[in-house]
């Protein structure tokens, strides 16, 4: 006898093909579907006699990489500070903020100007780090059993964090005001809370002048010198306080001799008056 292979009917072949497809869906590493959730939905639709269609959507990125990817934290805010200030003073014919920042960074003579933003950004970061470190140290010293104290300290940490943010905003606001006044008047203000042993008034003035001449190609007028009154001694002040014309008239009056006065007697002779 000759073994003749059994021929499958079209219906049987379709069922086998579907079974292979379902097995592939369950075992494939590329299938990112939630099969348990899919089975629940299909069973529900089957019980309710509702027609359904399964659609396949490609996943553009690997889900594992998406879950492991952490949010990028930008610690360097120099450009953010520069952009916030530059966009307020920018003229239509000037380069855009990103182009100007690239130009400023690539110019060696503008290194001091970039340092201004770097130093200010570090000051703001120190304020944030100070509040974060203090809150973490307080939380580490709390026993696990004292939940009420934990809530109180958490509220205190939130208040401290809020205060730190307000101080940093105030720092940046005064920093922008300092740059605007220096840019408009070609000289830094006499007093500012931004000044320290590094960022001095002379340093800010010279750095802004370099930015205007090198980056913006603007003519910088000489800074207006502040008027300081010269102290005057008391005797000299009294002498110079009287006008020259008045002094001459006083001298003339002193040299003039007063005329002699003629005195007339009040005694009158007796006239022909009756007794």
Curated annotation (Swiss-Prot):
Pfam families: Baculo_PP31. Its main location: host cell. GO terms for molecular function: DNA binding. Residues 265-275 have a biased composition (Polar residues). Phosphorylated. InterPro entries: Baculo_pp39. The keyword DNA-binding applies. Residues 68-72 are annotated as: Nuclear localization signal. Residues 227-275 are annotated as: Disordered. The keyword Phosphoprotein applies. It is found in: Host nucleus. One of its GO terms (cellular component) is virogenic stroma. Plays a role in both early and late gene expression. This is Protein pp31. It comes from Autographa californica nuclear polyhedrosis virus (AcMNPV). The gene is 39KD.
């Amino acid at each position: 006898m000759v073994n003749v292979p059994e021929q499958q009917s079209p219906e049987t072949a379709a069922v086998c093909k579907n079974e292979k497809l379902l097995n592939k869906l369950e075992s494939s590493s590329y299938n990112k579907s939630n099969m348990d959730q899919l089975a629940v939905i299909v069973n529900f639709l089957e019980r309710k006699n509702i027609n359904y269609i399964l659609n396949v959507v490609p996943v553009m990125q690997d889900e594992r990489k998406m879950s492991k990817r952490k949010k990028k934290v930008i610690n360097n805010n120099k450009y953010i500070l520069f952009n916030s200030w530059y966009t307020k003073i920018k003229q239509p014919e000037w380069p855009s903020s990103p182009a100007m920042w690239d130009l400023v960074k690539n110019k060696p003579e503008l290194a001091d100007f970039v340092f201004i933003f770097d130093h200010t950004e570090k000051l703001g970061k120190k304020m944030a780090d100070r509040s974060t470190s203090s809150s973490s140290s307080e939380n580490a010293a709390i026993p696990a059993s004292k939940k009420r104290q934990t809530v109180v300290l958490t509220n205190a940490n939130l208040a401290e964090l809020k205060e730190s943010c307000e101080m940093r905003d105030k720092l940046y606001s005064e920093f922008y005001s300092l740059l605007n006044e220096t840019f408009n008047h070609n000289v830094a203000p006499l007093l500012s809370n931004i000044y320290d042993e590094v960022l001095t008034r002379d340093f800010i003035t010279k750095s802004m002048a370099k930015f205007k001449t090198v980056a913006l190609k603007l003519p910088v007028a000489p800074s207006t010198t502040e008027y300081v009154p010269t102290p005057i001694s008391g005797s000299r002040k009294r002498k110079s306080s009287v006008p020259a014309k008045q002094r001459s008239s006083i001298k003339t009056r002193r040299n003039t001799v007063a005329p002699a006065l003629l005195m007339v007697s009040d005694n009158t002779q007796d006239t022909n008056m009756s007794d």
